[in-house]
Amino acid sequence: MSAMNIAVLVPVKKLDKAKMRMADTLDRSQRRQLMMVTLRRVLSALQKAQIGDVYLVASDPQVKNIACDLCVKFIPDQGDELNPSLELARGELCQNYDALLVVFGDLPMISDKDIKTIVRLGSSKPSCVIAPDKRNVGTNVLFLHPPYLLPFTFGGNSYERFRSNCEKLGVQFLVYQSQNTALDLDYPQDILDLAALRGHKISGLEEILDPGVLAQISQVTSMSGAKMGA
């Protein structure tokens, strides 16, 4: 699709530590299942887009198995901190690439069309393209052309940090707004939003998207909201 030589990094936490904000509504097994299914969906979209070489950055053996199953390259993650891990991966790879795409593995609705559009938006050099979360606070997808354009500053309020760094450097900053890329699965409410958008038809998530489970999640989120408002 693209004349650019692109590296794609998909960072993944250890599955036992994933989605801890949902611990009050989903048990450990359900959280692992949620992460594995959404990760496979993200990797499938990336493979269908055919925009570059895909690398999973992780330390979990089960994630490595997914990489093997889908013929995706695997980079062992040597640390627990996201930004240093990504910097190490970029340092190992990106001297051989024209651009870098970072996609998180908890985007159940992302499509190959979304990925192609983001790359197309960032085709001029230098440029940074961000797909923010639905709160316009975090960053779910980041495209850098060239790969070393900006330091990684993922974490709370990363959207504003990337924007500010682009402004300081005089770099083109572009935003891709899409329901598909905005919905990440960090909070119990995100499960309810996914069910509202897609019903109960995501293969592998039938148990989590069961109406009974959704009712329990809705009750917990309502109680949490009431406590915050009290």
UniProtKB/Swiss-Prot annotation:
A GO molecular function for this record? phospholactate guanylyltransferase activity
Quote the catalytic activity from the record: phosphoenolpyruvate + GTP + H(+) = enolpyruvoyl-2-diphospho-5'-guanosine + diphosphate
The disulfides recorded in the entry are none
Question: Where do the coiled-coil regions begin and end?
Answer: none
Pathway the protein takes part in: Cofactor biosynthesis; coenzyme F420 biosynthesis
Pfam families in UniProt: CofC
Keyword terms, alphabetized: GTP-binding, Nucleotide-binding, Nucleotidyltransferase, Transferase
Q: What is its EC number?
A: 2.7.7.105
UniProt KW ATP-binding keyword: no
Which InterPro entries does this one have? Answer: CofC (IPR002835), Nucleotide-diphossugar_trans (IPR029044)
Q: Among its keywords, does the record have Repeat? A: no
Q: Which GO terms describe its biological process?
A: F420-0 metabolic process
Q: Note the PANTHER family from the entry.
A: 2-PHOSPHO-L-LACTATE GUANYLYLTRANSFERASE
According to its UniProt entry, what is the function of this protein?
Guanylyltransferase that catalyzes the activation of phosphoenolpyruvate (PEP) as enolpyruvoyl-2-diphospho-5'-guanosine, via the condensation of PEP with GTP. It is involved in the biosynthesis of coenzyme F420, a hydride carrier cofactor.
Return the NCBIfam families for the record: F420_cofC (TIGR03552)
**Sequence similarity:** Belongs to the CofC family.
As a miscellaneous remark, the entry gives: The exact nature of the substrate is currently not known. This entry has been annotated based on its similarity to Actinobacteria.
This protein is called: Phosphoenolpyruvate guanylyltransferase
Its source organism is: Thermobaculum terrenum (strain ATCC BAA-798 / CCMEE 7001 / YNP1)
